[in-house]
């Protein structure tokens, strides 16, 4: 088995926070969030990272992240391009939004030759997640089922006090595998806990704080790439007429289909670390403070890549 590699999705642009979160400094020496994820990933055993970016941010991204990380890891780049579509499809007029997380991973298909983990560039996951992910990918291969995994977080460790968040709410089977993941696009905190709405706030449903949620930290075998690629044209045929400018091909969509078809089992690994991210501009000081605290406590050196 080839060693697991890490795929970092870094082509998006923050719609709520504004700007390029993936290269916005949060550390004492100008480090960005993904520096800390990569440091944790390297300690866990990952040696190769594939950044999925856009051509237009290539120079800025390499200067901000890629060049210094290359001192410690084997760094590769893949480019998520709007016009990378199956034969017979064209980019709808006026479309600028990327095609989603599944499309981002497919951009790296030719660089992946074994098991791989997927993360967002602008989420802080904590060291525990990378340890359990690397260990799982290193010891499991596809058998009669595709053997995949994901790392879940406690909902209360992933919410923002500054506004609503979107999270994949997970339901697990008794054996710890994933039954379903449902995207809740408006989850908010309130005085009694956490709740979500699906009708613009007309009604709300409470969610327990220990509900497992997905933060897009997935572990797949190479088989996933073929499945995602084969399904893309059908997804476009179904979704382009309904929402040509904003529909997105998400990873959980393919995962759910594979579970329902009985092709895959996804082991739900768990992290009790607190997630950090900049969903809103007001979240950034909290991230800076958390990184400063972890650095002072010795979890990270001041200079990660010295």
What are these regions (language model features)?
Residues 114-124:
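Short beta-strand-to-loop acidic/aromatic patch adjacent to the donor-nucleotide binding site
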Residues 172-174, 181-306:
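Conserved alpha/beta core of the MobA/IspD/sugar-nucleotide pyrophosphorylase nucleotidyltransferase superfamily
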Residues 2-66, 75, 80, 114:
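N-terminal glycine-rich phosphate-binding loop and ensuing alpha1 helix
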Residues 87-98, 163-168, 282-286:
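Short, surface-exposed amphipathic charged segments that create phosphate/polyanion-binding patches used
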Residues 64-83, 141-146, 157:
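A glycine-rich helix N-cap at a beta->alpha junction
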Residues 14, 124-126:
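A short, conserved beta-strand element in the Rossmann-like catalytic core
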Residues 127-215:
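Conserved core of the sugar-phosphate nucleotidyltransferase
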Residues 69-114:
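Short phosphate-binding loop-to-helix
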């Amino acid at each position: 088995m080839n060693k697991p590699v890490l795929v970092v999705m870094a082509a998006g642009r923050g719609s709520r926070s504004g700007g390029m979160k993936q290269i916005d400094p949060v550390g004492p020496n100008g480090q960005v969030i993904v520096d800390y994820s990569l440091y944790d990933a390297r300690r866990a055993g990952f040696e190769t990272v594939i950044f999925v970016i856009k051509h237009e941010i290539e120079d800025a991204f390499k200067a901000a992240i890629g060049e210094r990380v290359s001192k410690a890891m084997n760094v590769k780049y893949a480019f998520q391009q709007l016009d990378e579509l199956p034969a017979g499809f064209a980019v709808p007029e006026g479309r600028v939004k990327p095609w989603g997380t599944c499309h981002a991973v497919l951009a790296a298909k030719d660089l992946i030759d074994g098991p791989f983990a997927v993360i967002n560039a602008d989420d802080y996951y904590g060291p525990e997640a990378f340890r359990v992910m690397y260990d799982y990918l290193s010891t499991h291969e596809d058998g009669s089922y595709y053997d995949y995994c994901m790392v879940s977080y406690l909902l209360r460790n992933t919410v923002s006090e500054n506004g609503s968040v979107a999270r994949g709410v997970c339901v697990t089977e008794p054996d710890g595998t994933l039954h379903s993941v449902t995207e809740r696009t408006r989850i908010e905190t309130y005085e009694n806990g956490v709740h979500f709405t699906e009708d613009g706030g007309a009604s709300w449903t409470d969610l327990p704080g220990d509900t497992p949620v997905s933060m897009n930290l997935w572990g797949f075998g190479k088989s996933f790439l073929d499945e995602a690629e084969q399904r893309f044209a059908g997804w476009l045929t179904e979704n382009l007429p309904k929402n040509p400018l904003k529909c997105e091909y998400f990873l959980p969509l393919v995962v759910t289909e594979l579970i329902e078809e009985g092709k895959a089992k996804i082991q739900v690994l768990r992290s009790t670390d607190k997630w950090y991210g900049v969903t809103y501009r007001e979240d950034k000081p909290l991230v800076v403070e958390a990184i400063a605290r972890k650095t002072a406590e010795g979890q990270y050196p001041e200079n990660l890549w010295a």
